[in-house]
Structure formats: C-alpha cells, structure tokens
Amino acid sequence: MYIPAWSASSVDAYTTCPKKYYHLRVARDVQDFPPSEAVVAGRELHKAFENAVNLHEPLPSSQAHWQGLVDKIKAIPGEKLPEHPFMLDEFHEPCDKRGAWTRGIADLVIKRGKEAIIIDYKTGKRKPSEQLALYAAYAFAYWPEIQKVHTAFIWLKEKKIDRKTYNREDAAGIWQSFLPAVARMRKSYETGDWPARPSGLCRQWCPCEGCCYCGK
C-alpha cells in the first residue's frame, strides 16, 4: 500500500479531522473551498518577502516596514539555502522522494559552522506550531556537524516574530512528539478508517457536505 510521506502540515490536517483529510487528500472526491481574497493576498505577500530576501527585489510599499528585517536577514553570515527541501526515510537518513517517509520545505536555512537558522514566513493568523521544531530535527539529521538550530516564525500580517532554539539532544524528543499522530495516520491508510472529528470548523469551513457534521 502506498502511503505518502508525511509533513508537519499533513499531520496537522489529519489531526484536525481524519475524514476531511481523507476526502481532500486521499480520495480527492471533494474540492476544497477556493482561496479567499485574504489567502491570495497572503500568498502574494509571502512571495514578495521571499523575493526581497532571496532575489533582492524591493518590497511592496505597503510592506516597506519590513525592509529593516529583510536587510538584517540578508546580512546574516553563513550559507543561505532558500526554499530548502528536506526528505528523510524512516531511519532519519536523507533520501530522495521515492524513499521519503517525511518531508518539508524550509523558506530559508542559513548554515554557519555548528549552528543553523531556519526561518519560515507566515501570513495567516498567529498560532502555536511545531513545524519548525520538526525542521530542526530535519537539520540535525541532514548535517551531523550542526549542534544548535535557531528557528523563527515571521508573522508578516501581525508583525511578530516567534523564536526558539533547539540543541542536538532535543532531536529525539521532537521525533517522539510527532510519532503518535503519524502512527494514527498510517493506521487509517491501512484500515480505511477515517473518523470524523467534529469541531467549530464544521459550521463554515468544511467542504465535505456528505458528512453528518458539516454545517453544524
């Protein structure tokens, strides 16, 4: 049975509602809602910030207040790896996509000696996320010389930055924090059991009209 490589976003989507995950990502028999104007604007902002950092393009005038941060990021010494893909097998060894057990793409990785910085630009509502913890574990697996990873979520709309630092000895705990959800997802693929998980999102934010909780 083919089970696609999991990512932080797929685990989050599955945990929110396995049934919705199934219809949108496995069976693909339900179309998600088209992106709202806010989502489209967020994607454009994300791209503009990426281009400002990676390609030295000017920011839109409405986002000029971020120019100071863009300049600081560009001035950080080290090897810059924009849009860096991570793919690991079940033994946490780097691999190609055919053997990938887990995967992710970091907006920006900066390597400098025994340390790395991983940055992710966010345009949605500020909320807790373990995505960059997972990316730190990826970095420890990819580069044995890395002993410390500094992460930063940059919340572009809310003008906030959430920073956290991980040491190499944190890697095992990071993996353990994801494994229960990954195991549940794998079991759903194997058994075909994708239970609905009703929540407030069912009222307006679920396209699965065939679900008894949709719209309630």
Residue ranges, per PLM feature:
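RecB-family 4Fe-4S metal-dependent nuclease core
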Residues: 1-216
